[in-house]
Amino acid sequence: MSKADSNSRQGSYKANSINTQDSRMRRHEVTIELRKSKKEDQMFKRRNINDEDLTSPLKELNGQSPVQLSVDEIVAAMNSEDQERQFLGMQSARKMLSRERNPPIDLMIGHGIVPICIRFLQNTNNSMLQFEAAWALTNIASGTSDQTRCVIEHNAVPHFVALLQSKSMNLAEQAVWALGNIAGDGAAARDIVIHHNVIDGILPLINNETPLSFLRNIVWLMSNLCRNKNPSPPFDQVKRLLPVLSQLLLSQDIQVLADACWALSYVTDDDNTKIQAVVDSDAVPRLVKLLQMDEPSIIVPALRSVGNIVTGTDQQTDVVIASGGLPRLGLLLQHNKSNIVKEAAWTVSNITAGNQKQIQAVIQAGIFQQLRTVLEKGDFKAQKEAAWAVTNTTTSGTPEQIVDLIEKYKILKPFIDLLDTKDPRTIKVVQTGLSNLFALAEKLGGTENLCLMVEEMGGLDKLETLQQHENEEVYKKAYAIIDTYFSNGDDEAEQELAPQEVNGALEFNATQPKAPEGGYTF
């Protein structure tokens, strides 16, 4: 969304409101904030700890009680010519690295374990030894970037990719796990994995017979292959995953669904070409359907994907609308998790930055009632996004649509109340929305009515207070609104305040208009 002009729905803003560059910056900043929150929702690295009761895909193979060896004894055994001692040393190393707390990864690396493990990976005559070595390296690669780099620099990646074709499913699965940890370390490590043809290796592994635990690991690896920017992954490779990821959205497994959605959220967090590739994979109706799930671990990445898609072209946004996205977004605006409400409001704000037909679809879906509730009592981060949705509508909507915001959906009061926030960016968004409303009222001959409404709702007092704001843009915008619409000049004000003769008696404020029955409207 920060890559090119076409990446922002906000680019459709009119020149008299928020400028295009500012809105692109806003989309970029919001996406950065959302991307940071992913760390709470998805693990990029996973350690295979030594616990029989866990639902991890790989279990102890021999059921033997562990033999306690020192690190020096482990290394000596691994370097032995005796195959049984090699296996005992390798297994002991793996178990030490599989401790739930404080595994001695650096200690093992310092004792030269990694190159020995790499050598064992290539021992095709002993799949048990290969498996133990792969497991140990998986856990080393689950550590810090330096620890992962050690595994990469000893040329483990091509050996793991080769093991994807192993006849031992346990060994192939452990190789997938190791590659997932390596790819999850960052863009550079990810690209090393991709350039060793990992996609050629994993696609044949997915079929109707693939065990669920194995499938989960494969999809998690796929999500890490799609993740990270600066640079983004090579799209000529990643796009090969899209038909499979789209098909995986039909899975019944929560973990498979979640990781498939995360993968698509990473792909769509880019330019319109990549968004279109996801649209072409028929993923959108499936993503939209997943928005009605009860499981937040699925809703969050599915919503992120849909939110990214509506930052694309009008046609791409139309696919979301045609797939029934708006009613589901309306429900998510009422969700009990504030981060889901925030992202639903962010998604709606991008749709209202589109064309008038799309804004009408938002109106007809009843979403502005939900936005009003968010503005009134939602979490502040969600309120910010709701404010953008309103301001975008005042920018791009028809006069009838904008009037509906005020008269039908009663948005004005909670919208104005956000002028009290401490966040200058949000204040400016509300000020821009108000400026747009006044510009329309002027065209419709309703400026006086709108002024009275804003004043009755406390808006004038808030704007006057903002004239003392430390942010220059904020106080200049506040001054401009007051000066243009609320200031009639001193002479006129004095004339209004002077007593006038009415029916032979002096009255003050004799010329002040009386409020019409039913209140003020445009």
From Swiss-Prot:
Record-level GO cellular component terms: cytoplasm; nucleus
PROSITE patterns: ARM_REPEAT, IBB
GO MF annotation list: nuclear import signal receptor activity; nuclear localization sequence binding
Assigned keywords, A-Z: Cytoplasm, Nucleus, Phosphoprotein, Protein transport, Repeat, Transport
Major subcellular site: cytoplasm
Domain IBB per the UniProt entry, residue ranges: 1-56
Tissue: Predominantly expressed in the neuroblast stem cells.
Tagged with keyword Transport: yes
Region described as Disordered: spans on this chain: 1-28
Compartment annotation: Cytoplasm; Nucleus
Compositional bias annotation for Polar residues: 1-22
Quaternary structure note: Forms a complex with importin beta subunit.
Official protein name in the record: Importin subunit alpha
Species name: Drosophila melanogaster (Fruit fly)
Species lineage: Eukaryota, Metazoa, Ecdysozoa, Arthropoda, Hexapoda
This protein's encoding gene: Pen
